Amino acid sequence: MARSAFGWGFSVIAVLMVGSITACNTTTTTEPGQGENASQAPANLTLVSYAVTRDAFEKIIPKFTEEWKSKTGQDVTFEQSYGGSGSQTRAVVDGLEADIVALALSSDVQKIESAGLIQPGWEQEAPNGSIVTNSVIAFVTKASDNIKVEKWADLANPEVKVITANPKTSGGARWNFLGIWGSVTKTGGTEEQAFDFAGKVLANAPVLPKDARESTDVFYKQGQGNVLLNYENEVLLAKQKGENQPYIIPQDFNVSISGPVAVVDTTVDKKGTREVRDAFVQYLFTPEAQQIFAETGFRPVNEEVLAKFASQYPKVENLATIEEFGGWKKAQAEFFDEGGIFDKVITKIGRQ
């Protein structure tokens, strides 16, 4: 697939308008105007992403559309759909016509690939293996609580009520579960010990919300739980919005959470406007876009931008990658498919 060579040099603000498509939506468009190719037909793109990326994309998209308009004269409209990564993946496979997907884990993109909608090799179509953001798992506690939660083992304390999303619908929750499991198996424990520990932690969860954003609402707005397991970026964003609860980044063990992006080939080939879609994906890796990801809580993949935010994103020494779990294809089958480890843990503790 040919990629467009497109230079990016400045940013201006675009106009946001609310639209509707599915899950949680907005529409972003450029204003009509003159450009090098003003007669070029307008393009409409649908971005399908996971819940906690919304704040970042709603800042990035207007900058892209204005720069694209200035460079090419083409008006671009974005429709945006946000929800749990697993739910969003199923929606695309079931017919939601996405041009671009930005999901919580590569296995979700691989499911769309397996459905024949994305061509093999999508990982090589963008920089950094098409991983556009990184994050880690954070523990959020409450200043009013006397319960101490500083490391993974503390989550098994019967007095601790844990808020984490459901791995069946949330990509973030799958990362959380791998964190729970890996905190035992990657630090010298056995799988039997990990199974027992995971059961204790999930037994301490009063609810399993559908996605990371809903987990945040359950914890902050509904007041449930003593500790919230969530993306570091979601915690930092909540802090920016006034929810200033204490949090820690577990240092005894953590997981590097990688967010992939891909073009949905069947959609863009049908519409015949691959150039602008490819350009948008490439734009996500520019310093301008990476700066916005960093400002909205994500660890940028651009090293220069990451260096600027070093104090905000402390290095984690014992940091595992998905490859240490055998890659997402193996991890998905082993942990989260029907009858996998998560289902077995839920069955053991008698939870539906």
UniProtKB/Swiss-Prot annotation:
Induction: By sulfur deprivation. One of its GO terms (biological process) is sulfate transmembrane transport. Transmembrane segments: none annotated. It comes from the Bacteria. Keywords: Periplasm, Signal, Stress response, Sulfate transport, Transport. Residues 1-40 form the signal peptide. The keyword Metal-binding does not apply. Pfam families: SBP_bac_11. PROSITE patterns: PROK_SULFATE_BIND_1, PROK_SULFATE_BIND_2. SUPFAM superfamilies: Periplasmic binding protein-like II (SSF53850). One of its GO terms (cellular component) is periplasmic space. GO terms for molecular function: molecular carrier activity; molybdate ion binding; sulfur compound binding. It is found in: Periplasm. This protein specifically binds sulfate and is involved in its transmembrane transport. Belongs to the prokaryotic sulfate-binding protein family. This is Sulfate-binding protein. The gene is sbpA.
